[in-house]
Amino acid sequence: RTGVPKDAWLVDYEAHSKALQIAKECGVAHFVLLSAICVQKPLLEFQHAKLAFEQELIASGLTYSIVRPTAFFKSLSGQIQRVKAGKPFLIFGDGKHTACKPISDHDLGDFLASCLEDASRHNRILPIGGPGPAITPYEQGAYLFQLLGKTPRFKSVPLGMLPFLAKVLGGVGKIIPSLATKAELARIGHYYASESMLLWDFEKQRYDADATPSYGSQTLFDAYKQWVKEESIPERGDHAVF
């Protein structure tokens, strides 16, 4: 699914709701849900769909563990080939106004599985990130240049470009439906370009890297080193931004 409204409600809500119904019919006692940390500030349709199912699961009577990971390594792998080819690393604004604590597939899978046996993770919403400090897009680029032995080159994309595109495409989309879909994708892009994938402190109204739980052993920079060494970049699919 791409995150557009139709896909979101079919997959993030309806498919999950049917899976929950089947689980209850089969006598399943514990439902572990892979959600996303971005639902803590829901501005997009797919986030509302995810939240709707989270609430349905909580009310189901089953033991639940709702896991909200920060960011996936493969989502942050898209510019390795650009940098290897001598192209600049693309950033929104100065590349320092957002940050994340990404988690590897292996570490996340281990955390999900352990929810079944760890009673402290039962009937809880569990934000989770990977090990180490939060990393900005600028720091991701700087590390790649260092790893590849290249002079750092960044190209800034104006942060206001995406909401402008979304507004234009949304207006024209009332006449040409396919452009309405592109408008939603622009809104999604702007969200991830302007919001950190960290725990949101509702009282202080800011993201808190220190309060974002960490788990596992593999860092994003470990993965960068492995991918560059093996010349193997993960397939991103709908995780692609650049």
Label the model's feature ranges.
Residues 160-242:
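A hydrophobic C-terminal alpha-helical subdomain
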Residues 1-25, 38-40:
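NAD(P)H-binding glycine-rich loop region in Rossmannoid oxidoreductase-like domains
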Residues 11, 15, 49, 219:
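Soluble or luminal CAZymes and related metallo-dependent hydrolases
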Residues 20, 105-113, 217, 221-225:
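Short, amphipathic alpha-helical "lid/cap" segments that border enzyme active or binding sites
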